[in-house]
């Protein structure tokens, strides 16, 4: 919605979830003819609030005109929001699965954690049964999600 200097703060780069969300971020920038700036892309080795805070600090030293931040996790988002509040910066933050209702996120993707956990467990049980019966089956499940704008 009018932002052009959008940062990405993700979890460990080796995780598929981080890579998938990074790919989505890069594709969105490309679709809107926005530059990809590696100085606005960060990867935490752990999903911790302090990592989001510290990356925000680095980000605004490099680019004080950053006008939106996407995080891959609500803990990282919490650190980002704390930094923004502390420095009285009005920058929208978008994240995945907002577990803290007090976070002032512009929007988040509700990944339906309950259904994700239940489906994962059921799939693991099915795989165990298939292995016992010498069956090899490829599983793919899509869990419904929702974008929640505040």
Task: For every predicted segment, state its role.
Residues 4-6, 67:
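Short acidic/polar active-site loop segments enriched in Thr and Asp
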């Amino acid at each position: 919605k009018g932002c052009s200097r959008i940062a990405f703060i993700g979890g460990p780069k080796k995780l598929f979830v981080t890579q998938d969300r990074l790919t989505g971020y890069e594709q969105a920038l490309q679709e809107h003819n926005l530059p990809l700036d590696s100085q606005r892309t960060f990867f935490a080795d752990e999903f911790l609030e302090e990592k989001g805070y510290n990356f925000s600090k680095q980000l605004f030293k490099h680019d004080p005109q950053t006008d939106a931040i996407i995080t891959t996790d609500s803990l990282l988002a919490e650190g980002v929001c704390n930094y923004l509040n502390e420095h009285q910066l009005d920058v929208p933050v978008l994240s995945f699965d907002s577990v803290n209702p007090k976070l002032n996120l512009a929007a988040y993707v509700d990944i339906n954690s309950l259904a994700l956990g239940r489906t994962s467990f059921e799939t693991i049980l099915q795989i165990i049964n298939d292995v016992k019966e010498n069956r090899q089956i490829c599983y793919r499940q899509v869990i419904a999600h929702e974008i929640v704008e505040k």
